[in-house]
């Protein structure tokens, strides 16, 4: 059995710190582009986690093609992403389950990263051969015009999360989301029940549809409880490359700090906790913080982070079902599916 490649193995190979390698793979923190690219290339070369998926099952596919629902000559299920998927619970477990579900179809899954230039010029990744592609699944594809270009390819297509869709024509594709509203509102209710009155939001609400839905769920909840003063201290810097610094500068200007923050995801929450600490505020003693995703980091971050758990296995199973049924029945009406999430209370909200 092959030895599992770890972040420390990659760090040793490149003579870098484990923390630096983790930042590159998880797309957190600030790194020079050249350093990030070097780490990601080495991760793919060494077969780290999802990077080892390229490609699988090609030999068997040719032998058993007749039993597959896939069109003749099209064996590839292409995963497109604007960045390598992190090792957080959701984005590492979902592709694993997705791949296990498509194995019996005698297909193989490939992962293609959309470069910034390809994104800007609305071009497919150079590594993708569309003539051999039976279907496409998209992660972290949040540019609306690029998403529309993919919809025009006439290839079965599934988006896992999408660009913000408010006041825009719908995408002609199936869409899969995690449930973003219910547990955000439960988190706000929990804070209110424990005496928190000034509750704010942190994160770029326009980053993607899920972030937008989380913000709207937060806003609806504080308005429901009549506690709208927290709306004036939401920390929502947008389009910033150096997000932790932008977040710090945003909250540093607040004349009054909130009692609690609901965050767009765990990495925003962790950046926020660090910024608050630099400003002399303790979490949870002074301010409560809730994340979203329930990433692996959430359970060992200090303080342990209250978060909203995404069921990666269920997301992967549902994604496979949506894409395979689209391949089998291309004329189906487009579907939008949400999967359950759950609030996990931990130390950052005094639990």
Where in this protein do the model-derived segments appear?
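An alpha-beta-alpha
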Residues: 185-227, 335-350
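Short, solvent-exposed amphipathic alpha-helices that sit
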Residues: 89-105, 183-186, 209-229, 271, ...
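Short beta-strand elements in bilobed, periplasmic/extracellular small-molecule ligand-binding domains
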Residues: 102-114, 201, 219-242
């Amino acid at each position: 059995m092959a030895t599992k490649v770890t972040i420390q193995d990659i760090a040793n190979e490149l003579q870098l710190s484990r923390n630096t390698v983790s930042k590159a793979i998880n797309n957190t923190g600030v790194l020079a582009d050249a350093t990030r690219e070097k780490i990601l290339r080495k991760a793919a070369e060494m077969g780290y986690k999802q990077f080892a998926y390229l490609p699988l099952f090609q030999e068997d596919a040719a032998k058993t093609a007749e039993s597959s629902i896939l069109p003749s000559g099209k064996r590839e299920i292409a995963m497109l992403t604007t960045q390598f998927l992190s090792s957080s619970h959701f984005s590492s477990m979902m592709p694993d389950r997705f791949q296990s579900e498509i194995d019996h179809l005698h297909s193989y899954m490939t992962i293609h990263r959309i470069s910034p230039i390809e994104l800007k010029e609305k071009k497919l990744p150079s590594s993708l051969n569309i003539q051999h592609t039976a279907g496409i699944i998209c992660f972290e594809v949040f540019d609306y015009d690029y998403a529309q270009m993919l919809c025009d390819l006439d290839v079965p297509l599934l988006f896992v999360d999408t660009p913000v869709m408010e006041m825009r024509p719908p995408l002609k594709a199936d869409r899969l989301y995690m449930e973003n509203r219910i547990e955000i509102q439960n988190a706000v209710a929990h804070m209110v029940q424990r005496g928190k009155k000034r509750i704010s939001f942190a994160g770029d609400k326009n980053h993607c549809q899920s972030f937008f839905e989380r913000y709207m769920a937060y806003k609806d909840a504080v308005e429901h409880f009549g506690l709208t003063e927290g709306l004036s201290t939401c920390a929502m810097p947008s389009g910033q490359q150096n997000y932790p610094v932008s977040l710090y500068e945003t909250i540093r200007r607040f004349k009054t700090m909130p009692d609690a923050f609901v965050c767009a995801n765990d990495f925003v929450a962790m950046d926020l906790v660090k910024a608050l600490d630099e400003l002399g505020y303790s979490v949870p003693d002074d301010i409560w913080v809730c994340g979203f995703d329930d990433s692996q980091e959430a359970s060992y971050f200090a303080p342990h982070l209250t978060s909203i758990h995404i069921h990666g296995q269920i997301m992967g199973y549902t994604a496979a079902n949506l894409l395979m049924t689209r391949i089998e029945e291309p004329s189906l009406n487009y579907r939008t599916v949400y999967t359950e999430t759950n609030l996990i209370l931990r130390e950052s909200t005094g639990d």
